[in-house]
Regions:
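Short, flexible/disordered intra-domain loops and linkers
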Residues: 18-22, 49-61
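Active-site regions of metal-assisted phosphoester/phosphodiester hydrolases
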Residues: 1-39, 70-71, 75-254
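Phosphate-coordination/substrate-recognition cap region in phosphate-metabolizing enzymes
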Residues: 64, 68
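Short loop/turn segments at strand-loop or loop-helix junctions that form parts
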Residues: 10, 43-46
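Short active-site-proximal "capping" loops at secondary-structure junctions
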Residues: 45-50, 83-84
Length: 254
């Protein structure tokens, strides 16, 4: 029985470095594989782009999702949010365990910025109730984020049983640090880094993190360990640091 889960969240910046200068997906996959996470929450996954597939010789023929999952994460889910003539990008989940159901909800607050909430139910061996894993990437403007957070809390209330183990992770763009209060009051969740270290992690920019934009919110778990993966090497990988957490399921959780 898997009482302990290792999870990661990472905004991969569409698989390229700043200003689309270099292709970074191979470095990103190598880093993810070394972490050996059970479930990975990804944002800005560009699964198709006609121009980049021609420009970058190493662009995977199978698409970014299948390339990242490889053999380590046999199950994956992709939520297409933003579409354009050359392709599309969105949120994604990689899982070592079977994903039994996935829904991508549209939580866009404005026509100019498409956003989604990717919700997957995962069968973890030995658990009698699925893990609910939700990946989000919220908007750049506070007004839009407020609307999106309301959508997220309402959707979770409708689609996630109150007793179910729940993880919400991703890029919240939450400059005002309001998400934690909203999730605590409405969903009974807490942020992993805040519980373990007192404050959410600094995750942006990755080479010298200052802003606390990326989060991991949990319900039904103890937080055993958290870590920010950042530093100079991330200049060639992504503008966001990667966050990981080791979570232990609460014994009396169904």
């Amino acid at each position: 029985m898997h009482n302990t889960l290792r999870i990661a969240t990472f905004n991969i910046h569409k698989g390229v470095t700043h200003f689309n200068a270099r292709f970074a997906l191979h470095h990103q996959r190598d880093l993810l594989r070394r972490l050996q996470a059970d479930v990975v929450f990804l944002q800005e996954v560009r699964d198709e782009h006609a121009e980049h597939s021609k420009r970058f010789a190493a662009w995977p023929e199978t698409g970014q999702m299948e390339y990242l999952s490889n053999a380590l994460w046999p199950d994956y889910a992709y939520g297409k949010n933003s579409t354009y003539p050359a392709g599309h990008h969105g949120n994604a989940l990689l899982s070592k365990f079977p994903i039994i159901k996935t829904t991508n909800f549209d939580i866009s607050a404005h026509a100019s910025e498409q956003r989604g909430m990717l919700h997957s139910e995962i069968n973890v061996p030995g658990w009698d109730i699925p893990l609910h894993a939700i990946c989000v990437h919220l908007g750049l403007f506070a007004k839009w984020r407020r609307e999106q957070l309301l959508s997220v809390t309402n959707l979770i209330a409708q689609h996630v049983p109150a007793e179910a183990p729940l993880i919400i992770a991703g890029d919240f763009n939450d400059w005002g640090m309001r998400t934690g209060r909203i999730f605590a009051e409405n969903l009974g969740m807490h942020e992993a880094f805040e519980q373990h270290a007192g404050k959410p992690a600094r995750s942006f920019p990755s080479w010298l993190p200052i802003l606390r934009l990326d989060r991991i919110y949990v319900r039904g778990f103890h937080v055993k360990h958290v870590e920010v993966h950042s530093g100079a090497k991330f200049v060639k990988i992504s503008d966001h640091a990667m966050l990981t957490a080791i979570l232990t399921r609460v014994p009396n959780s169904p």
